[in-house]
Each structure stands twice: as C-alpha cells, then as structure tokens.
Amino acid sequence: MLMAQMLGDKFSILMMWDRWKMLYTKTLGELGMEHKCASMRSIGVTPDNKSLLAGKEDEVFPLLLQAAEKCVEEDGAQVLILGSTTMHEAHFWLSERIGVPVINPGPLTYKLASIALDLNLTHSKATWPTPLSPKHDMIRAIGAAGAAYLEGKQ
C-alpha cells in the first residue's frame, strides 16, 4: 500500500474472494490510509494455494481484468495491488492490458528486503525487539524461494 502511494494518489486492491476484505480493511486502518483506497474488488474465486492459477488462466484472468477495469474506470484507481500472491501469475498479463501500475506483492517484498540488506538497514530495535525464538531456517528458505523466482524471470 505504501508503494502504491509512491506510484499514484488512489489505489485499489484486487482480491480473489471477499473473505480477505477484513484483512485489507484492518491494514488500511492501521496505516491510516483508508482515504487513499479507491476500492477493494473481489473476483469471487476461492484461492488455490497449491496450483495457484495454473490451468485456470482462461477463467480467472478475464475476471481480474474486468475487476481491474472497474477499479480504474468507476472507482478512480491510479494503481492496482494484487491482494494475494496467489494471483502472481496474472501480473504481467494484467499489467499489459490495464494502463496503470499493477503491484505484485511477492517480488516487490523480496526486492525491498534485498535493498534493505544491501544498504545495511534494519528495523528499529527500540520498536521491534529481537525475537525470543528466531526462525533463521524459515527466513533463509523464504529468501532462497524469492531468489529462485526472480532468477526464473530473467
């Protein structure tokens, strides 16, 4: 959401299903960004965390485009956010067709973390103390998966 504000004034969130709306509403409130969200639109498709959108492109991609067009034309969104990494396969396809920036949260988060590491930036320990039980293996696995994904895109 913060990146969306760097790219435009108003943004919309595309969701797979309505069950996630409360999570975005909560985050918007915590960030004080309710007034910057043009809309949240669901395509009414239950997310598939295993096969994602594979084999469903002909069904799901047009639904995403239809919702995205409503976000831009009816709601005034200047930036779109894919509300879940389960939609990442539609990012390039949708970006080519909609005319406004489309944020893909997975690769963006990976790149931001990489930049922070390169610049030796870390969180404020005054705000966020060191965890009692660090999960180093999990963090390494997330980093490796992100790197593998980006290598496959180049």
PLM regions with names:
Residues M1, M16-R19, P105-Y110:
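Short, acidic/turn-prone active-site loops that include or flank metal/cofactor-
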Residues Q5-S42, A116-Q154:
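Short, glycine-/small-residue-rich phosphate/pyrophosphate-handling segment
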Residues L7, R97-I98:
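Short, structured coil segments at secondary-structure junctions
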Residues R19, T27-G83, A90:
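Active-site rim beta-loop-alpha module in soluble metabolic enzymes
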Residues K70-V72, G76, S95-E96, W128, ...:
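Metallocofactor- and cofactor-centric catalytic cores in central/energy metabolism, strongly enriched
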Residues E89-E96, I115:
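Catalytic cores of alpha/beta
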Residues I103-T122:
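Short, flexible loop segments at boundaries between secondary-structure elements
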